[in-house]
């Protein structure tokens, strides 16, 4: 199964989410590959992880810019799960990744929505459905330690409503990229971590994987759940 993680900004939340999902998935005994559109970034992280003896070990690959569908097809038999940090830019590689993904996870900051970038991302997600009608899109709200406030809630809900058949995660991530947990580590496996942040990542993981087969709920139901969570 291929899961892509994209967003509209070059913010670290996308990479943080991808790495934590990969670690938690590998910990469950699955063969996991973590891919990125940025050459070397996750390879360096994986090398640091290996050097520090951190387990589970994560295989990392670069998506590349050519023959992406062929590359992904070759990797499918080798891994149970492929997680792809697909970046924030509208590239051919990103489009190919979205066309091959079963689920797209979109971390979004309600208080930092750039209108131009927002519509570019929404167009990319809606366009991916033309080639991949069964694609599912899961937005994840990201806020500061005390958020989300009323304006952030409204912005996130409006953002989600503009993507066809998109859903909103019940989990809210509070400043997930605020701390450095050491070379090759993330909050899900750091020796000394923030238990609240780790619990949020675990909750997001549970939403992404445990409920994936039944994620096709109506937008109305999901928006209602989001409102209930944030009251």
What does each model-found stretch correspond to?
Residues 33-34, 84, 106, 139-141:
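Structural beta-sheet core signal
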Residues 143-150, 154-189:
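Beta-strand-loop-alpha "switch" segments that mediate conformational coupling across diverse proteins
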Residues 2-12, 19-95, 99, 131, ...:
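P-loop/Walker-type NTP enzyme "switch/lid" segment
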Residues 8, 37, 109, 142-144:
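Cofactor-binding loop segments of dinucleotide-utilizing enzymes, especially the Rossmann-like FAD-
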Residues 87, 101-120:
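Conserved Switch II/interswitch segment of TRAFAC-class P-loop GTPases
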Residues 186-231:
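NTP-binding/hydrolysis catalytic cores, primarily Walker-type P-loop NTPases
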Residues 118-133:
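Conserved C-terminal guanine-recognition region of P-loop GTPase G domains, centered on the G4
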């Amino acid at each position: 199964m291929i899961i892509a993680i994209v967003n509209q900004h070059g913010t670290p939340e996308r990479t943080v989410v991808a790495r934590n999902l990969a670690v938690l998935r590998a910990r469950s005994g699955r063969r996991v590959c973590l891919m990125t559109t940025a050459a070397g970034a996750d390879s360096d992280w994986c090398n640091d992880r290996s050097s520090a003896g951190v387990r589970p070990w994560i295989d990392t690959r670069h998506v590349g810019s050519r023959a992406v569908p062929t590359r992904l097809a070759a990797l499918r038999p080798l891994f149970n799960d492929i997680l792809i940090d697909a970046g924030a830019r509208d590239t051919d590689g990103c489009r190919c990744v979205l066309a091959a993904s079963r689920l797209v996870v979109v971390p979004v900051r309600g208080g930092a929505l750039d209108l131009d970038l927002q519509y570019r991302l929404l167009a990319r997600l809606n366009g991916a459905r033309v080639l991949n009608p069964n694609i599912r899109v899961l937005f994840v709200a990201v806020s500061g330690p005390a958020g989300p406030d009323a304006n952030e809630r409204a912005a996130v809900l409006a953002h989600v409503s503009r993507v066809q058949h998109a859903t909103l995660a019940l989990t809210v991530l509070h400043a997930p990229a605020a701390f450095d947990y050491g070379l090759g580590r993330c909050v899900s496996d750091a020796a000394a971590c923030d238990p609240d942040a780790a619990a949020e990542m675990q909750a997001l993981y549970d939403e992404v994987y445990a409920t994936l087969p039944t994620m096709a709920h109506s937008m109305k139901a999901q928006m209602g759940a989001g409102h209930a969570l944030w009251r």
